[in-house]
């Protein structure tokens, strides 16, 4: 016997039909502006959160991704062209980086197809991310609460570890869930006083004892000089995952 169609499913399909039909009566530009207003509403009760996401956080996240993409691309090329890569974006903020990766690699046109998960401890990001980037699956969890049996091929982690009291413990837990590589960005040797919510300075010593593939320093518009004119750099690090291969 087939499972009965739920009332919520029928309701959602009915509403989708109404919204789609109504949108046909609006100019395309009005629909775009309406979508941005809905994004802001979904980002949190305070509209300033959504405005911050669209005007500042997402542009910064995309700029960091542009900096890291050549490295990610080289790693993607190690996989068969027609394969699927499981990628997790950890600490995705409002999802712009993972969303763009999912859109770019939604098929095998550019090589391996990506299946993107986004993991964050902030539950309020879920609605904004899943509405803005529907190809992403959002996971509300800490890395230590993810089953060791749940693994990914590649991790992308931009400007997260400097917010942690113990980044080494986080890195160990992360690598145990990654078969391929972890690509990380973080402020390099940030001058004191550290930026808001930053807890540690990141340098080469942070990664001692870990399987480092590469460590480079870069300058990026996403991490500009301070108000006092002090130049700042980002570190771009690639680590090898330590997850056990599935038999």
Spans of features found by a protein language model:
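Conserved N-terminal segment of class I S-adenosyl-L-methionine
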Residues: 1-150, 158, 171, 197-209, ...
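A short, conserved alpha-helix within the catalytic core of class I
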Residues: 164-174
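Active-site beta-alpha loop architecture of Rossmann-like, nucleotide-cofactor-dependent enzymes
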Residues: 93, 162, 189
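A short acidic, helix-capping loop that chelates divalent metal ions and anchors anionic groups
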Residues: 190-195
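A short SAM/SAH-binding and catalytic strip from SAM-dependent methyltransferases
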Residues: 154-165
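Conserved beta-strand signature within the Rossmann-like core of class I S-adenosyl-L-methionine
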Residues: 179-189
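Conserved acidic residues
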Residues: 85, 153, 180
């Amino acid at each position: 016997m087939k499972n009965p169609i739920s009332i919520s499913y029928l309701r959602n399909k009915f509403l989708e039909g109404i919204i789609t039909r109504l949108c046909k009566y609006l100019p395309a530009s009005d629909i775009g502006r309406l979508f941005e207003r809905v994004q802001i509403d979904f980002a949190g009760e305070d509209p300033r959160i959504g405005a911050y996401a669209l005007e500042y956080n997402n542009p910064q996240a995309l700029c960091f991704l542009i900096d890291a993409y050549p490295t990610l691309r080289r790693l993607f090329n190690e996989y068969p062209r027609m394969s699927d890569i499981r990628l997790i974006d950890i600490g995705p903020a409002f999802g712009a980086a993972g969303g763009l990766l999912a859109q770019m690699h939604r098929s095998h046109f550019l090589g391996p197809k990506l299946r993107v998960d986004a993991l964050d401890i902030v539950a309020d990001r879920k609605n904004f991310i899943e509405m803005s980037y529907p190809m992403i699956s959002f996971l509300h969890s800490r890395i230590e609460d993810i089953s060791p049996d749940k693994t990914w091929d590649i991790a992308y982690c931009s400007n997260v570890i400097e917010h942690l009291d113990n980044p080494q413990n986080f890195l160990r837990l992360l690598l145990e869930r990654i078969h391929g590589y972890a690509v990380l960005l973080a402020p390099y040797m940030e001058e004191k006083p550290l930026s808001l919510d930053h807890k540690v300075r990141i340098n080469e010593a942070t990664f001692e004892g870990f399987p480092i593939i590469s460590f480079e320093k870069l300058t990026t518009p996403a991490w500009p000089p301070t108000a006092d004119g002090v130049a700042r750099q980002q570190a771009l690090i690639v680590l090898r995952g330590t997850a056990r291969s599935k038999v």
